[in-house]
């Protein structure tokens, strides 16, 4: 069971390596917060079990995505009590609670990120240091995502009616 694993001061980038995912922002943040462990999942040859162990141990699943339709990895993180740190844009806008969103303009591109870097760093520190207090909110977020976006109940009801 990946939920309830001992958490590390770890931030995960679970996305594919593509320009619109803005890995450069994640890498720059790692240089400014070296006291935390930073994992880019796609640079490793992970089994599913290894991937879920990393999620289970992480405190944050980070996104600065400029393109996203559903964002399964952030949901997976929430299921194992990791903070889904997402921009207030794209599908994240309607899917995630305000507690886990940061202003879209902070990461619209690398230049915008450099202007808002300290604010992002402060938010990461808050999520890491106060993670235990955030767990009830993460549970609420995961339940909301499951009920509204990651269920086929309504689809099956429509098909079978």
Predicted regions, residues:
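Conserved donor-binding/catalytic core segment of Leloir-type glycosyltransferases
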Residues: 1-21, 27-31
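A conserved nucleotide-sugar
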Residues: 23-50, 132
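Short hydrophobic beta-strand element within catalytic cores of glycosyltransferases
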Residues: 83-86
